[in-house]
Amino acid sequence: MDDKDIDLFESQYVVPNGVSYNSYVIMDDKIAIMDTADARVTDKWFANLREALGDRKPDYLVVSHLEPDHASNIQKVAEAYPDMQIVGNAKTFNMMGQFFDIDLTDRKVVVAEGDKLSLGKHELTFVMAPMVHWPEVMMEYESTDKVLFSADGFGKFGALDTDEDWTCEARRYYFNIVGKYGAQVQAVLKKAAGLDIEKICPLHGPILTENLGFYIDKYNTWSSYQPEDEGILVACASIHGNTKKAAELLAEKLKATGVKVAFTDLCRDDMAEAVEDSFRYDRLVLCACTYDGGIFPPMEDFLHHLKAKAYQNRKIAFVENGSWAPTAARQMKAIVEGFKNIECVEPVVTIKSTLNKAVSYTHLTLPTKA
């Protein structure tokens, strides 16, 4: 269900088109509820659940992920249906007591990799997905309708009735929520390759039913930290606007060569989108001024985000500005040299206060390909 009133997802990511919290019900001889929803939509979720159940009662609640945006209503639904069993893995139940004050000892169904749960015509097979993006995460494959319940995998920002391309907000969601855990996503993709999947049901965003190879290929690219497109992100952090003017001029010159260029003002634009574009393209230009002998904080914050999300396999060039002792490039370079497989482009462009004819960007326009 949609939440269009939320301002920040995880209290940090802007979601102008809201977000959805997806919960599913499998109706069969036995009934399984697949996850709950955020506390923000509790009343609506229970109303939808009761409508789906009619005069029947659920047999199982399957807990794919304990994060509160999906699990906030576990205790309430368990109390509403006292005969319902709770399905999770060992890590699920180890963590559950940290969130809820309810004794589920006699109601637990503990599952592991490859275990099956028959509902009648439908059968769930459990696929462990640790650290995608919490340690207890698991997915479920339903073999009759060939559905993968993918937890946070293949999710995106945006309400379900938002008319927008899947890729952009799915990419922003992936790199900012799951991006650090590429190896773990790769492991799950290998498991999924052995399944006959016709539908993917994530916990956020639309159900995917067509051209599934497109979405899986995107996840394979993203989780292997390979560039999705050839292009350059010019990211700037400017105090009084002079560094930004230089960065904008550079972006214009790069575009004139036929290169795809994205631009972000780190002082004003969405940080999550800057992270997204950094991973999308194969090259990055960092433009920042020196501040109190260090890096201007918006740029330093950006580099912290890239480090946290395991940014790698890219080329990076540097533009620095300083009125008396420019050191930003040296310090930015010291940070990114700690990233995996990064090529630092030389020479550094140094600006003293304002741009003038002595500053050359020629070296940054070449090579036009990674």
Protein language model features and the residues they cover:
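Helix-loop-strand module that forms the ligand-binding subsite of alpha/beta enzymes
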Residues: 267-343
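Metallo-beta-lactamase
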Residues: 88-210
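Conserved small/polar residues in nucleotide/adenosyl-binding loops
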Residues: 361-368
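Short helix-loop-beta junction
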Residues: 248-262, 338-341
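Active-site metal-binding motif and surrounding structural segment of the metallo-beta-lactamase
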Residues: 29, 40-87
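Active-site neighborhood of phospho(di)ester-bond hydrolases with catalytic His/Asp-centered motifs
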Residues: 34-36, 59-66, 87-89, 148-151, ...
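Zn-dependent metallo-beta-lactamase
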Residues: 1-30
